[in-house]
Design a protein with these regions (language model features):
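Local sequence-structure signature of Cys/Sec-based thiol-disulfide redox active-site neighborhoods
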Residues: 1-24, 28-33
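Thiol/selenol-based redox catalytic cores and closely related redox-interacting motifs
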Residues: 33-113
């Protein structure tokens, strides 16, 4: 397994995801989205596995003005706006090769090889 966890250090679900893999002695790479966001390729891969860009955005987030701006941005510009503002992406994003999840999903992770 090649696990990557994209999240923030303050996010409780990200901390729970890290704990899940540590308890099972599964090595993972943590990527702090405040320091280094996702590349366009990484984002597209995760979005494709999770039902598209709309599902990647945490519409319940704190920055309502930014979320409203993204919501009404033209579809062709939406991806760039989300990549410029990684704080709107649901976390943690956990990747294992082509497989990925959004949020804390231990039942799915247990099935990964």
């Amino acid at each position: 397994m090649n696990i990557q966890i994209f999240g923030t250090k303050k996010c409780n679900d990200t901390k729970k995801a890290e704990r899940f893999f540590k308890e099972r002695d599964i090595k993972f790479q943590f990527i702090d989205m405040k320091e280094k966001g996702m590349s366009k390729g990484e984002f597209n891969s995760v979005a494709q596995a999770n039902g598209g860009l709309e599902n990647m955005v945490n519409w319940d987030g704190k920055d309502k003005d930014l979320l409203t701006l993204i919501k009404y941005t033209a579809d062709e510009d939406k991806l760039e706006k989300v990549l410029e503002n990684p704080q709107v992406i649901k976390t943690p994003v956990v990747r294992n090769g082509k497989q990925s999840t959004l949020g804390y999903q231990p039942d799915i992770w247990k099935g990964w090889d």
